[in-house]
Amino acid sequence: LAYFKETCIGGESMRKKIRVAGVVNDSIVDGPGFRFSVFVQGCPHGCPGCHNPKTHPFEGGVMMEPEEILERMKKNPLLKGITLSGGEPFCQAEALAYLARQVHAAGWDVVCYTGYTLETLLAMEDPHIRELLEEVDLLIDGPFILEKRDLTLLFRGSSNQRLILVKPTLQTGSITLMEEDV
């Protein structure tokens, strides 16, 4: 956990903007429905076989205001929501929690990928991580494990990753998985 705090939590300027590696305006593979996918820059996991290794360095990418992302989303009336991927979204939890609140206020849903497990995120007891979790509808958790790679899985790359419905999970304290027949 100390490594997370040292590596992922940036200075004050990092919290106001989001360091973005790239965006996909209309993805159909990063969650249910048409999605606006934001790939954040910076990841401490370094999973062998990662789909997005260029997102690992914490330098690079571009700094974007959450409002700029929202304005881009508003241009596509077919969107179901936003997907936060990376990189590691929880390394920018404060700014992404703010963005996710605005996304919900506009009527969209929030999907988030993380290389952490939900249990690890909750154990960090970081208020910004908790704020982001509370704004996520569907969490795809766990690191990509090359030996468990399975291209038949819905929205995941390896069989250890889970599709967690966050709101009922936080309410009950028991993991609620998404049905995979969407």
What do the predicted segments below correspond to?
Residues D137:
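Receiver (REC) domain switch/active-site residues of two-component response regulators
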Residues H45:
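Glycine-centered loop/turn positions within well-structured domains
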Residues R15-A21, F34, N52-L132:
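Conserved Radical SAM active-site core
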Residues Y3-F4:
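Aromatic (phenylalanine/tyrosine) cluster motif
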Residues V24, P143, K167:
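Residues at the C-termini of beta-strands that transition into short coil/loop
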Residues Q92-H104, V111, R149-V182:
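P-loop/Walker A phosphate-binding loop and immediately adjacent motor/lid segment at beta-alpha junctions
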Residues K75-T83, I140-L146, L170-V182:
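Conserved C-terminal portion of the radical SAM core fold
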Residues I9-F39, P48, N52-F58, I175-T176, ...:
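N-terminal [4Fe-4S]-dependent radical SAM core
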